């Protein structure tokens, strides 16, 4: 790709990566929003917006459709035993949320804040904290260092920074919401099943906010950083 912009063909290749994201984990679908930040100055503004938002819609439709398909899969015996022992019922949990939205909302927000630090401490563990997996922490550290410190010539606009922040918050919030529905006891004030590795995409996204400098001088590396975040 050119240092100043990318072609529609190259943009489509990037979108294929974005489509793979929700197929791996639906809550990371927010990362696909990075396509809105890619430089396409050689394309008319109206057409550029149409392509970007259209591609984003495709990612959401494909990811959402695949997620609905996977909900038809039966859980294994180990999961079933846990769900039964912990009185987990997604249908009743949703009914509780809808019937006590205000009460649940306050408790959920407080839970998001209180459990965040504990979740970060799990970044070097895999599964239910039974297996040490230090490489996860290494991946996060390398990604953070690459985006934040190596590329000193990247400067995002205020709106771009705001969008990236929303993507990060969205990943964390919807990961917790998904676990609250599928792994947490009905009416519980805590979220069960959260693992630090779920936050690696969020940390990589937020690390992009640390870049400073003139983005016009180094847009090639800017595209590389966005692609690295998507792949990882």
Go through each PLM region and give its residues.
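Transmembrane helix-loop junctions and nearby membrane-interface residues
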Residues: 40-43, 71, 176-183, 211, ...
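Conserved beta-strand->loop/alpha-helix structural units within folded catalytic cores of enzymes
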Residues: 14, 18-35, 133-145, 198-205, ...
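Transmembrane alpha-helix segments characteristic
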Residues: 155-185
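Interfacial loop-to-transmembrane junctions
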Residues: 218-230
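Hydrophobic alpha-helical membrane-interfacial segments at the cytosolic entry of transmembrane helices
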Residues: 12-18, 45-69, 162-170, 227-231
């Amino acid at each position: 790709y050119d240092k100043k912009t990318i072609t529609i063909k190259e943009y489509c290749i990037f979108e294929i990566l974005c489509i793979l994201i929700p197929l791996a984990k639906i809550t990371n679908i927010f990362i696909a929003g990075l396509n809105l930040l890619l430089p396409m100055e050689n394309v008319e503004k109206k057409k550029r917006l149409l392509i970007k938002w259209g591609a984003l819609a495709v990612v959401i439709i494909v990811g959402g459709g695949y997620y609905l398909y996977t909900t038809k899969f039966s859980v294994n015996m180990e999961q079933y035993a846990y769900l039964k022992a912990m009185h987990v019922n997604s249908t009743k949990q949703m009914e509780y949320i809808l019937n006590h939205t205000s009460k649940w909302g306050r408790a959920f927000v407080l839970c998001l804040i209180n459990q965040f630090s504990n979740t970060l401490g799990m970044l070097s563990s895999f599964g239910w904290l039974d297996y040490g997996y230090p490489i996860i922490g290494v991946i996060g550290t390398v990604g953070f260092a690459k985006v934040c410190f190596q590329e000193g010539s990247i400067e995002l606009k205020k709106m771009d920074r705001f969008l990236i922040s929303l993507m990060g918050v969205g990943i964390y919030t919807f990961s917790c919401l998904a676990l609250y529905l599928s792994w947490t006891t009905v009416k519980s004030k805590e979220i069960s099943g959260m693992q630090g590795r779920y936050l690696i995409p969020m940390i990589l996204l937020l690390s992009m906010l640390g870049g400073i400098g003139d983005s016009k001088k180094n847009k090639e590396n800017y595209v590389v950083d966005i692609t690295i975040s998507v792949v990882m």
